[in-house]
């Protein structure tokens, strides 16, 4: 995880990034499934990082069947690629990444989907 010494400073890496097959769990919450606007690629990358028996925990979008890809803008910043994927849509996306739904859990208004290889 890159860190900076100052808020506007360049990041420095404090430890090597994870390699294929090294992680027990990958956590994609708070909308992180949308990073890059290609959830299928993000799931494939997450699956590749998993050690045998590992899982990917994804916070799904608020609408179960939703699968939206496009761009968003935060304030005056540039457009960035983003996606939103509901729990049912994750069930459809998971097999292409070699994953399957193991469990779905709701906590208040939030839905979490655990995927396993």
Task: Report residues per predicted region.
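S-adenosyl-L-methionine
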Residues: 2-21
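Active-site glycine-rich loop that binds ribose-phosphate moieties when present
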Residues: 11-16, 37-40, 44
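Core SAM-dependent methyltransferase catalytic element
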Residues: 97-117
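A short glycine-rich, Lys/Arg-flanked "PGG" loop and its adjoining helix->strand segment in the class I
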Residues: 40-55
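Short alpha-helix
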Residues: 80-104
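Conserved class I S-adenosyl-L-methionine
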Residues: 55-76
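Conserved beta-strand edge residues that scaffold enzyme active sites
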Residues: 9-15, 63-64, 107-109
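A short SAM/SAH-binding and catalytic strip from SAM-dependent methyltransferases
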Residues: 21-41
């Amino acid at each position: 995880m890159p860190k900076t010494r100052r808020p506007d400073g360049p990041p420095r890496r404090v430890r090597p990034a994870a390699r294929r097959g090294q992680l027990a769990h990958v956590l994609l919450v708070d909308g992180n499934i949308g990073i890059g606007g290609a959830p299928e690629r993000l799931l494939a990358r997450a699956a590749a990082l998993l050690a045998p028996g590992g899982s990917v925990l994804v916070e799904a979008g608020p609408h179960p069947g939703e699968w939206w890809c496009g761009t968003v803008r935060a304030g005056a910043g540039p457009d960035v690629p983003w996606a939103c994927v509901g729990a049912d849509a994750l069930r459809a996306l998971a097999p292409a990444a070699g994953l399957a739904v193991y469990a779905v859990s709701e906590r208040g208004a939030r839905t979490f989907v655990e995927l396993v290889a």
